[in-house]
């Protein structure tokens, strides 16, 4: 009889590789035998808080895997190119056959191998990819030892304890602990650079390293609240939020892609200087710097048409300031990104409340679909 996640003990996997011909030939790697000799390894004392992390780790780790991608050698203008390992990261079991990871982990591979925490390897194939959310789904040829992990429908408050499980630097079954440090962050989409940001991201102080990407950020009841994605320095890591996972992943499984709403505007944050230059009552809302020609907002919203000097700084003037969408307050750029990402679909008409020439008015904008990255 299959044991539940709560009954299965996790086994920390070692660094391992696999042949590009398949995923059954794991080779080499570091093990506990690599510990320094001549000194007794003393385990630290267990504290009152430790059992929480032990329990959640043992419940979650069988459902987490290391993801390794490979490419075949390709002909280039300089001759045959080198093939071999292309990318490495982590992933977690979303349902019985599908593993969620990051799009930047998957890339465009010829072979995907997944290593479970019992050190077995299985082949996987790409089901769907979404560069704009940096999420991807692969289908496994065989199951993992654990059960699918539940995904939260909302984000926990700042200060909630979390655990990140994955394969940093190829070290399968690794765990780091921390708290939720922030919510509603926006981070660059690494596989769609310079175009759009990932909305509603979760921030954590748990250590993230190369290879953690795609692994779950879980609360101490084993619920996924984020997918580890990026780090911006010591104790500053980010993950795709569970709310965005719930939006994107079902579509990737069903159709292989996800369509993001597109308003067709470039925006900047309203700070005190911009507010002063535009005679705004306070530094709140999102300033429309430009409108994409022939885009959804063209002819409806207004972008910058001048500039002013405030305290020696040049600020844009004349653009609309978005203060609400469908009656929901938009206080800053992350609010706008989050609402479009979680509450709308291409083709929806949204009521955009703006401050224009000192007065509020509400205008209808029918959203389009983001262009290909």
Feature locations, PLM:
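PDZ domains, with a preference for the canonical peptide-binding region formed by the helix
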Residues: 16, 105, 313-316, 324-353
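A conserved glycine-rich beta-strand in the N-terminal activation segment of trypsin-fold
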Residues: 47-55, 70-96, 120-125, 148-150, ...
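Flexible, gly/ser-rich surface segments that form the specificity/activation loops bordering the active-site cleft
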Residues: 149, 160-196, 235-237
